[in-house]
């Protein structure tokens, strides 16, 4: 997984491999959520903020065959004191079809 900050958006790429299967040839949904959580957490990290995932919801829209390159992004939705709400999205890199998205809240360290 490669991640970087660009114009206040954390972007990244990830290509699931065979060991990431939930069942033959299809990427496990838990791994897709992990990729979304990682890009959202890195939005914090790359801005020198430290915290943890306090709550998260995920919506899966498409199956992801193993070997499919994904484009990831995380954006700030709202900030209230120590609570930051982010939106994460994952698309197939080749055609920008949305495969999964997450809305999550992160609690900053004190």
Q: What residue ranges belong to the model's regions?
A:
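Residue-level recognition of well-ordered beta-strand positions that form the cores
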Residues: 13-15, 57-59, 73-75, 89, ...
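Hydrophobic core residues within well-ordered beta-strands of beta-rich domains
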Residues: 8, 52-54, 70, 84, ...
